[in-house]
Curated annotation (Swiss-Prot):
This is Type B diterpene cyclase. It comes from Mycobacterium tuberculosis (strain ATCC 25618 / H37Rv). The keyword Transmembrane does not apply. Its EC number is 5.5.1.16. Changing D293N: Loss of cyclase activity. Catalyzes the formation of tuberculosinyl diphosphate from geranylgeranyl diphosphate (GGPP). It could also react with (14R/S)-14,15-oxidoGGPP to generate 3alpha- and 3beta-hydroxytuberculosinyl diphosphate. It catalyses: geranylgeranyl diphosphate = tuberculosinyl diphosphate. Monomer. PANTHER family: ENT-COPALYL DIPHOSPHATE SYNTHASE, CHLOROPLASTIC, ENT-KAUR-16-ENE SYNTHASE, CHLOROPLASTIC. The lineage of its organism: Bacteria, Bacillati, Actinomycetota, Actinomycetes, Mycobacteriales. Strongly inhibited by 15-aza-dihydrogeranylgeraniol and 5-isopropyl-N,N,N,2-tetramethyl-4-(piperidine-1-carbonyloxy)benzenaminium chloride (Amo-1618). Inhibited by GGPP concentrations higher than 50 uM. Optimum temperature is 30 degrees Celsius. GO terms for biological process: cellular response to magnesium starvation; geranylgeranyl diphosphate metabolic process; tuberculosinol biosynthetic process. InterPro entries: SQ_cyclase_C, Terpene_synthase-like, Terpenoid_cyclase/PrenylTrfase. The keyword Glycoprotein does not apply.
C-alpha cells in the first residue's frame, strides 16, 4: 500500500478520477474532427461493453448510470462509420437498450430522487438523438414523463439566464442537444484550459455542436485521452478535491501536527489549497475553477484549520439557505453529505451545539435519515456508509445520541468476515475503510471499546486494500476517485494499528 506522501503527490496531479463509458462515448463521437481520438475512445468502449450488452458500472448497479452510458455508447456506435465496423457490439447494445427500457426489466428502475447528476436534463436529449438514429426506446413516453417536471424545475432555477461557466448546468451542457444552442452563453462557457466545466463529455459536445472544431476544447480532450488508455474521466482536473480529501483522511489518524517533519511533508499541498482559497467564496474541484462549492469548501476549511491555517468561515456560510446549506447555487435538492461536512467546518470554527446554524444542520440531517434505519444516503455517493461514517465524525459532541444510533447501525451491519458493503453481493474496501474510521473515532470519543470489531475489519481490509475499486461516487454517471479511496484505506489501516496499541 502507498504512503500518504506518495498519495498526495498523485493527488496534486488531479488525475485520479476514473474513466466512464458515458464521457468516453462522447469523445468517440469526435470522428469527424479527430479520427485518432475517436478511435482510441471507441476501442476503450468496445473493450468494456458488459456481458449483457450494456455499458456503465457493473457494480454497483445504478439504473440511471446504465441507461445514460448505454444510450451515449449506442449513439456513438451507430453514428457514421462505426455501425458497420462494430456490428457485433451494436447488436448486443440494441438488445441491452431494449431490456433497460422494457417494462419487463428486472432490477432497480428509475428513481428521480436517487438519480445521477443532471440525469433529468441529459436523458431526454439523448433519447431524442437516439430516436433520430432509429434506436428504439421502449416506454420512452413513460420515462420522459417522470423527468419533464424535474427538468423544468431545474431550468426555472436559472431564471431565464443563459448557461455559462458560472452556473452548475454547464457541467451538463450537452443537455442543449443539437437544436438548443440558444440556451447557452456560447462565449462564456470555457474554462482557462479549454474545457467546459472540466467535463470531457460537455467539452466534446461543445467541440461538436457549439463551436465546431474548437481547438482549445479538442486540445483539452486530447491531453486526457493521449495520456491514458483511451478512456475519458468523469471530470478533470480535480487536484483540490483530491488533496483536501486525502488530507481529511490523514487527519482522522493520530498525527503530531507539531512535528516539523510532518509539517514540511504536507506544506506544499496545504499551500496550494490556501493559495486558491478565495475569501468569502472558498474553493472548487481545481485551483482554476470558476465555480466554488460548499462541499469542497467545507472539507478544505476543516483541513486547513486543523493544519494551522486560517481560512474564513464566511466562505462556508455563503451557501446557507433557510433550512440547510446548498452545495451550489441553483441547486434543486440539498445534499446530506455536504451538510455533514458543513457541520465539521462549524465544529472546527468553534460553533457551540446550541448555535442556530448547528441546530439547523442537525435538524435537516435528522429529518433526512433513511426510513427504518439509522443511516443516511446522499446524491454524491451511492453508499450509506460514506455519509453515515462522516456524520459520526462531524456530529460527535453536537448530538451523541444520534451518533450512537448510527454506530449501532454500522455494528449491526458488519459482515461475518469483518467487512461492510451496502449493496447485495460484494463488500468493498472503501466502505469498510469508512466504517473503521467511524468506529475508531467513536471509540476515542465515547470510551466504548470497539477494538474487536475494528481488528476484525482491519484483517479483512489488509487483504482487500488494492485496486480496482468499485465506482461508488456519483457524477453524471458513477465513478471512482482512486486517490481519495486509497487515502481512506490507508487512514483506516493506521487506525487499526492505533486501536491495537
Amino acid at each position: 500500500m502507498e504512503t500518504f506522501r506518495t498519495l498526495l503527490a498523485k493527488a496534486a496531479l488531479g488525475n485520479g478520477i476514473s474513466s466512464t463509458a458515458y464521457d468516453t462515448a462522447w469523445v468517440a463521437k469526435l470522428g469527424q474532427l479527430d479520427d485518432e481520438l475517436s478511435d482510441l475512445a471507441l476501442n476503450w468502449l468496445c473493450e468494456r461493453q458488459l456481458p449483457d450488452g450494456s455499458w456503465g458500472a457493473e457494480f454497483p448497479f445504478c439504473y440511471e448510470d446504465r441507461l445514460l452510458s448505454t444510450l451515449a455508447a449506442m449513439i456513438s456506435l451507430t453514428s457514421n462509420k462505426h455501425r458497420r465496423r462494430r456490428a457485433a457490439q451494436v447488436e448486443k447494445g440494441l438488445l441491452a437498450l431494449k431490456n433497460l427500457t422494457s417494462g419487463a426489466f428486472e432490477g432497480p428502475q428509475l428513481d428521480i430522487k436517487d438519480a445521477t447528476v443532471g440525469f433529468e436534463l441529459i436523458a431526454p436529449t439523448l433519447m431524442a438523438e437516439a430516436a433520430r438514429l432509429g434506436l428504439a426506446i421502449c416506454h420512452e413516453e413513460s420515462i420522459l414523463g417522470e423527468l419533464v417536471g424535474v427538468r423544468e424545475q431545474k431550468l426555472r432555477k436559472l431564471g431565464g439566464s443563459k448557461i455559462n461557466k458560472h452556473i452548475t448546468a454547464a457541467f451538463s451542457v450537452e443537455l442543449a442537444g443539437q437544436d438548443g444552442v440558444g440556451m447557452l452563453d456560447v462565449d462564456n462557457l470555457q474554462e482557462t484550459n479549454g474545457s467546459v466545466k472540466y467535463s470531457p463529455s460537455a467539452s466534446a459536445y461543445f467541440a461538436l455542436h457549439v463551436k465546431p472544431g474548437d481547438k482549445r476544447a479538442l486540445a483539452y480532450i486530447s491531453s486526457i485521452i493521449q495520456a491514458g488508455d483511451g478512456g475519458a474521466p468523469a471530470f478533470y482536473q480535480a487536484e483540490i478535491f483530491e488533496i483536501v480529501w486525502s488530507l481529511w483522511n490523514l487527519s482522522r489518524t493520530d498525527i503530531d501536527l507539531s512535528d516539523p517533519e510532518i509539517v514540511r511533508t504536507y506544506l506544499p499541498y496545504l499551500d496550494h489549497v490556501e493559495q486558491h482559497w478565495v475569501r468569502g467564496r472558498g474553493v472548487g474541484w481545481t485551483g482554476n475553477s470558476t465555480l466554488e462549492d460548499c462541499d469542497t469548501t467545507s472539507v478544505a476549511y476543516d483541513v486547513l484549520s486543523k493544519f494551522g491555517r486560517s481560512p474564513d468561515i464566511g466562505a462556508v456560510l455563503q451557501f446557507e439557505d433557510a433550512d440547510w446549506f446548498r452545495t451550489y447555487f441553483h441547486e434543486v435538492g440539498p445534499s446530506i453529505s455536504t451538510n455533514v461536512h458543513v457541520l465539521g467546518a462549524l465544529k472546527q470554527a468553534g460553533y457551540d451545539k446550541c448555535h442556530p446554524r448547528v441546530r439547523k444542520v442537525l435538524e435537516f440531517i435528522r429529518s433526512s435519515k433513511e426510513p427504518g434505519r439509522f443511516c443516511w444516503r446522499d446524491k454524491w455517493h451511492r453508499s450509506a456508509y460514506y455519509t453515515t461514517a462522516h456524520l459520526i465524525c462531524a456530529a460527535s459532541n453536537y448530538d451523541d445520541a444520534l451518533c450512537s444510533d448510527a454506530i449501532g447501525w454500522i455494528l449491526n451491519t458488519q459482515r461475518p468476515d469483518g467487512s461492510w458493503g451496502f449493496f447485495d453481493g460484494q463488500a468493498t474496501a472503501e466502505e469498510t475503510a469508512y466504517c473503521i474510521q467511524a468506529l475508531a473515532h467513536w471509540q476515542r470519543h465515547s470510551g466504548t471499546s470497539l477494538s474487536a470489531q475494528i481488528s476484525r475489519a482491519g484483517g479483512w481490509l489488509s487483504q482487500h486494500c488494492e485496486p480496482p475499486y468499485a465506482p461508488l461516487w456519483i457524477a453524471k454517471t458513477l465513478y471512482c476517485s482512486a486517490t481519495v479511496v486509497k487515502a481512506a484505506i490507508l487512514s483506516a489501516l493506521r487506525l487499526v494499528d492505533e486501536s491495537n496499541q
